[in-house]
């Protein structure tokens, strides 16, 4: 049995989850739902920096090589300590020895894989999906790593019968298990940037042709 493919998220999707009861963050290329953590430690003042960062990327908190919180030499004590200019947060030690510091919490939250829900896309793009049967058009932000089948999943809220259509680009059927790039839908953003042309002036269009089999997903 092949492993389950992780889901990809756009920064915009992460940013929508920005309240205490529904709090996501991203760091080091992964997306995390920290809502259970906040519920578990409800009322703890050390949650404040995490709550303030809700819906955002906090990769700058961490050392990309170790995956741990960044460290520095404390100028007052000369000791190595966590670098937390945003304020000390949950599971980081206090600056000075403290009898009330309980480090018997096991794995720190930033290394707890159970909070991970997916991968942050390295590049997103807007496409237009045009239903040739109804002439309806939908703009959709997608992840460059997603296959057409996964993009279909994003489109389902707008068309519950999306699986009953043949998906085409420039008149050619798309391979549903390949990405846009692998299907020849090239990302020209870099070329547009070199030419100083706004990338949103061109949005690739995917055309859907009804198969008349009433497939329901």
UniProtKB/Swiss-Prot annotation:
Keywords: Cell projection, Cytoplasm, Cytoskeleton, Heme, Iron, Metal-binding. Heme binds at residues 41, 72. GO terms for molecular function: metal ion binding. Residues 6-72 form the Cytochrome b5 heme-binding domain. It holds the Pfam family Cyt-b5. It comes from the Eukaryota. Radial spoke stalk protein that binds heme under oxidizing conditions. Required for the coordinated beating of multiple cilia maybe by functioning in a redox signaling pathway. This is Cytochrome b5 domain-containing protein 1. One of its GO terms (cellular component) is cell projection. Belongs to the cytochrome b5 family. GO terms for biological process: regulation of cilium beat frequency. It is found in: Cytoplasm, Cytoskeleton, Cilium axoneme.
């Amino acid at each position: 049995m092949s492993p389950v493919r992780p889901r990809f998220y756009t920064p915009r999707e992460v940013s929508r989850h920005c309240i205490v009861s529904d709090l996501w963050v991203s760091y080091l290329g992964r997306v995390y739902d920290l809502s259970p953590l906040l519920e578990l430690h409800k009322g703890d003042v050390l949650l404040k920096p995490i709550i303030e960062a809700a819906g955002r990327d906090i990769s700058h908190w961490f050392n990309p090589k170790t995956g741990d919180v960044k460290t520095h030499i404390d100028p007052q004590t000369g000791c190595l300590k966590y670098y937390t200019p945003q304020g000390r947060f949950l599971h980081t030690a206090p600056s000075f020895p403290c009898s009330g510091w309980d480090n018997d919490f096991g794995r720190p939250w930033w290394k707890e894989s159970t909070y991970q829900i997916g991968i942050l896309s390295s590049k997103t793009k807007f496409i237009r999906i045009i239903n040739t049967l109804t002439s309806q058009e939908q703009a959709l932000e997608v992840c460059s790593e997603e296959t057409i089948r996964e993009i279909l999943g994003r489109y389902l809220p707008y068309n519950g019968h999306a699986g009953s259509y043949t998906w085409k680009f420039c008149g050619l059927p798309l391979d549903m298990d390949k990405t846009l790039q692998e299907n020849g839908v090239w990302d020209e953003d870099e070329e547009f940037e070199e030419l100083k042309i706004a990338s949103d002036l061109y949005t690739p269009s995917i055309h859907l042709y009804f198969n008349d089999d009433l497939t329901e997903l």
